[in-house]
Amino acid sequence: RIIENFMTEIKRKGSRSTKDIPKDILEQLNSGQIETANLIEWLAVDQKLLLENLLKQTDRIKYLSPILSNIENLKKQTVNTINEVIGTEILNQVTKNNDFDFLEIISKHKSDLIRCWATYTIGKNPKLNVKEMLEKIQAFSADKHFGVREICWLAVRPTIAKNLIKSLEILSKWTNKEDENIRRFASEATRPRGVWCEHIEELKLKPELGLIILNPLKSDKSKYVQDSVGNWLNDASKTQPEFVNSLCEKWKAESPTKETAYIIKKAMRTIDKERK
């Protein structure tokens, strides 16, 4: 699914394996001149080199050493953990140096990975309350690059989980936004189990809390949104199958559309599998 999303939305065709990435393309990726075209390229970018190039280009090379030290201290270095550490330490450096202009630079950068770092400068900012944090992350939820959209909900999910009721209330208003990416964020960021992230235990036990987001999206025209809503309910079905079964029956009666039928099929896949 991730690869498909990357492949369909970036015009330049990406390589099918790391070894096939042309040298000049890799150099442009590592210097922040172009966006990644698919997941293969996204994983191939040397984030430490990209960071060094960014800091040289913007005359902020003094930030490099403390950020690299934090990366070296990671127990496990993955694309996501390095992403998070760089974003968090950039926030620390700009705060210490009163250099908030740098946040504007990285938020609008050509490189999708640099924009990913920017999402963590929001998600890791202790001075922001949940309302302010979600307001700031909304622009990233509408980013044209799938990678940024995926990382932005990861960056704020811990705060969403800690302020669940307030977050659900705020995100429920995103379900009527014109941009399908913003609508999808409301669902994806609150999935009970989610991907690459900690579960939200309260939603695993009480998925009905999510109805404020799910109900408005039950017949959304966007497949991107439909997939997320279906996955949300499939998550919930692993701990509260009765709730999901009952809701799907209700939606089937209330909303006999092909969009709702698609969501229901996706939502019921674990339950249906266990019935066989």
Where in the sequence are the language-model features?
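Surface-facing alpha-helical segments and adjacent helix-coil boundary elements at the starts of domains
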Residues: I2-K276
